[in-house]
Structures are given as structure tokens and as C-alpha cells.
Regions:
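Acidic, glycine-enriched active-site microenvironments
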Residues: 1-337
């Protein structure tokens, strides 16, 4: 149903985001739109287990989704998952408990005519972890890197090996945070790593930061969020020198105590200089506006259009939000818009 080259897909068979093809029957086109509305791509996965092969012996195509609640970690037992399923026609279960919870890996393949396909890993999980990534310079000490709060992944470092966890979700969810702490203990035991340094995000309210600050590991190091993005990009491309990093990220606690967003950072993996940035915006509703883009749009429009016209501009494009927009602006401090 989709045109895509699979020459770069690894044998672990991750979910691959494929571009929808317009040259399909109407009912298939409608099905694809229902699966991923307003999205040019759909996730496709080949069978990677004997159970999948048995099921697909009777079906040409299966639409699959996870059994866990949104933002919740994978359920490991029948007792955890069955109460949340509600009314379903059939349940296929097994007595084996899921001991090491791991989401599916997700990959995107870039295809350009005349060029070799390039596979980009968007979520490194099942089939890829905990196989370590190789570092260009060995570390003299064992390190625990806690990661951020959203779409969390932590890492353990020993020598030239960086052992990344699977995708753990958003840590503001209590069950996800509990799983985060448990997975750290399990991986430390698995690889017999005893960190002497713990690295965390600068954001003081991040659950991962608070975990690090409460840790018994004495040496702690805070890293600015956007600098971490720059360092990750340099490492992924095996670039050891300086570079200009343009980081368009939703949120990051800055070294000046404000929330950063679109940043131009000049530096390397060890240090960087903030040489440019987007103009600061009002964040209606605080950091919650990061999850609701219309609030950020409202914050950008307020100083340009004023309160009344900004509300009308946002409400015109999303009429269902008119009341919410109006109430939010009324709740904001009276400033000279």
C-alpha cells in the first residue's frame, strides 16, 4: 500500500514510518487516513515473533496498538493489563511474565532518487538495547546519565561503552517514573556498573533531576538541555570539533534560569556559547503551553496584535478553543499588550 525501499531495514524489524501512497483504492486510502489522520506517514511492522507469523497466516494485514494506557509503561502480567482492556471480543494471553519491559523501536527511512536510502532511528528500543553505543574516547569513570523528563532514556557509561535504556515515556506519570528507577537498578546490576558520577538536566523540576539530586552518588553534574542536543548530534555524526548547532526544541531550562526554545549554540561536546536565539515569548499557562501549541501561538501574538485581536486570531482558526482562549487571557496578569 505504500511505496518505500526496505534496503536499510535491520533484522530486528522495528516499526518503520512509511509514506502513504496516493495510488491506492479508496477504501485503503480511507483506512490509512483513519489510522494516522492528517499525517503523511503510517507505521508498518513486519512480524518479528512466531506468534505474529501464526496470526498473519490467517490475515493479510493487522492493525495493532499497545494494550497499556497512554503514557503508562508496558504491563508485565495479566493482572495488570486485563482490568484496563474493557469490552473486547477475544483475549490471547500467556502465563509468561514480561520481566524486561521494552517498547517497539521506531525507524524512518529517507529516500531520495539517485541516492542511497538512509535509515534514521527515532526510538531505539526492542532489538537494539541494551547493545552499547561506542564512544570515541573511553570514560575514566562509570557514569549514570538520567536524561530528560519527556520520552525519557537514561544511559550507563563504562569505558568506551554507553548502554542506553529503552524508551521509558514521560516521567511525570507515576508508573513511568517507578519503572525508570527500577530499570536503572536492573541495568546497573546487569552490567555490574557502579557509577561514581551522575549527570542530570538543569531543570530543577524534572523528575529525572530530582532523582539525581536525591541519589547517594556524591558527584553530580547538571547539563543544559539544548547543549545536550548539540552534543548528541555531534556524537551521532562522529564530529569531534566545534560546530554551530541550531536546536529547535520545545523546552529546556537555560543557564539564565529561563525556558529556552529556538537556540543557536556554537561549541563542542564539552562547552558551548549561545550566539543566537528566538525572541522570548509569553507562555500563557506556564510550561503547560509547551503541550498546547495554541497557547504558544497566543503568547507570540499578544504583543503584536493586542489582547482582543490575538484572541480572535487564534479562535478563528480553532473555533472550539474560543472560550478557553478568552478565559486564559483574562487570567493572565495585566501587562501592556
Amino acid at each position: 500500500y505504500m511505496k518505500q525501499h526496505f534496503t536499510r531495514i535491520p533484522p530486528a524489524r522495528p516499526i518503520v514510518l512509511l509514506r502513504k501512497c496516493c495510488e491506492v483504492e479508496v477504501d485503503i486510502e480511507r483506512m490509512l487516513e483513519d489510522l494516522s489522520p492528517n499525517n503523511a506517514r503510517v507505521g508498518v511492522m513486519l512480524p518479528y515473533s512466531p506468534l505474529h507469523s501464526l496470526l498473519l497466516a490467517h490475515f493479510d494485514l493487522l492493525v495493532m496498538t499497545s494494550a497499556n494506557e497512554r503514557e503508562e509503561p508496558i504491563s508485565g502480567t495479566d493482572e495488570e493489563v486485563l482490568p484496563s482492556l474493557g469490552e473486547v471480543d477475544f483475549i490471547l494471553t500467556h502465563t509468561r511474565r514480561i520481566w524486561n519491559k521494552c517498547d517497539d523501536s521506531v525507524m524512518l527511512v529517507h529516500h531520495h532518487e539517485g541516492l542511497e536510502d538512509r535509515a534514521v532511528m527515532l526510538r531505539r528500543a526492542r532489538g537494539f538495547v541494551p547493545v552499547p553505543l561506542q564512544l570515541p574516547h573511553p570514560s575514566a569513570q562509570e557514569i549514570l546519565c538520567c536524561g530528560g523528563d519527556l520520552k525519557n532514556v537514561f544511559a550507563l557509561v563504562r569505558g568506551a561503552n554507553a548502554y542506553l535504556s529503552a524508551h521509558l515515556g514521560d516521567l511525570e506519570n507515576a508508573a513511568a517514573f517507578e519503572n525508570f528507577a527500577m530499570q536503572i537498578e536492573r541495568m546497573q546490576d546487569m552490567f555490574r556498573i557502579k557509577p561514581s558520577l551522575i549527570v542530570h538536566d538543569l531543570h530543577p523540576a524534572y523528575h529525572s533531576t530530582q532523582y539525581a539530586l536525591r541519589s547517594t552518588i556524591q558527584r553530580k553534574l547538571g547539563v543544559q538541555h539544548h547543549h545536550a542536543h548539540l552534543a548528541a548530534c555531534l556524537a551521532e555524526n562522529q564530529h569531534e570539533g566545534r560546530a554551530l548547532g541550531i536546536i529547535f526544541d520545545g523546552t529546556g531550562y537555560g543557564t539564565d534560569g529561563t525556558i529556552w526554545g529556538g537556540e543557536f549554540l556554537l561549541g563542542d561536546v564539552a562547552q558551548c556559547e549561545r550566539v543566537g536565539r528566538f525572541a522570548p515569548l509569553t507562555m500563557p499557562g506556564g510550561e503547560q503551553s509547551i503541550r498546547d501549541p495554541w497557547k504558544m501561538a497566543l503568547g507570540a501574538l499578544l504583543p503584536i496584535l493586542g489582547r482582543t485581536e490575538a484572541v480572535e486570531c487564534v479562535a478563528k482558526r480553532a473555533p472550539e478553543l474560543r472560550q478557553s482562549v478568552a478565559l486564559l487571557t483574562l487570567a493572565m496578569p495585566m501587562v501592556d499588550f
